[in-house]
Amino acid sequence: MTGLYYEQFDIGMEFKHSLTRTVTESDNLLFCALTHNPQPLHLDEEFCKGTEYGQRIVNSLFTLGLVIGVSVGDTTLGTTLGNLGMTDTRFANPVFHEDTIRSVTKVREKRESKSRPNAGLVIFEHYGFNQRDEEVAFCVRTAFMMKTPL
């Protein structure tokens, strides 16, 4: 499926994305390497044995990127002009290696662009859940969306 245009989004619309992903150790290691993040909570098994989790946790920005990325095919693929910002980000529970993440997206609000007659702003709520239905990530994202071409 391709993304939707501005006019196709309705406030309250909800997407339960069918694409899921089981997060691997390699995902976490590669993300940490690519972002130059040496945090021992993500990389050092021995260090993590002494934490409240007892094991490594997945980088939260990987988790957020996954939750939003999974939404693209159903919402913004080929129809967005870019992200304008994210707010209210939270990580209620950690993600561990081998957790399976699913995503839900809701349309919170939308409005016409004040500067671009061919575009509008859609504000999404993105939710990520693990296989135990625990929320692992949330954010509010403002997307600059194309209007249907004339």
Residue ranges, per PLM feature:
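HotDog/MaoC-like acyl-thioester-processing domains
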Residues: 1-11, 91-100, 104-150
